[in-house]
Amino acid sequence: MNNFITLPYKLEREAPPFEANAIKYPESLVRHFLHLYTKRGDKVFDPFAGLGTTLFVAEDMGRIPFGMEYDPKRYEWVAGQLQHWTNLIHGDSGRVAAQGFPKMDFCMTSPPFMAKNHQWNPLYAGDPSKAGYAKYLSRMKAIYRQIATIMKRDAMMVVQCDNLPGRVYTPLVRDLSLTLSQVLKLENEIIVAWDGGKKDYRHTHCLIFKNR
């Protein structure tokens, strides 16, 4: 498997009126992995649906999208544009195993990022009792342990993530690969160079896992 690819950086779908497109990855990234790992009719899951890029592209390519989204505005905006809108659940991905999802063929997402020197934990909506980077990584492992139960055996799972510069550097790619490989089999790390990307965002990382 090639561990370095180049894809066009173009955000094709307009952002919703309530926020910019800063949280989404380009549609080209989803197309690449759907071509690589899925076929028409396959069930594609995104546990952190965000602005719906994975789900929209999956539906456009004849796959069946499923997902979860915690933010009510994002959920309503995405669900309102999906043909399979009932497959998107408004709720906490930490409860994915309780939603009654069918077995999935493929999973792709960009989870909420967290810097190691921050206390506000996006996976707990900032609950002070769940603050800190260690609890973030622990929660991410627990979420993917649940996701594994709704995936078919040997199903491929892609996690897009970036290292976070700043006053304290966060090696998020390394930390997520080590954390999630405790519940999934790490197959590869693919570096994606952006053709036409922003000056401060020339590449990203995709961790490739296989369900055990």
Regions found by a protein language model. Name each.
Residues M1-R212:
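Class I S-adenosyl-L-methionine-dependent methyltransferase catalytic core
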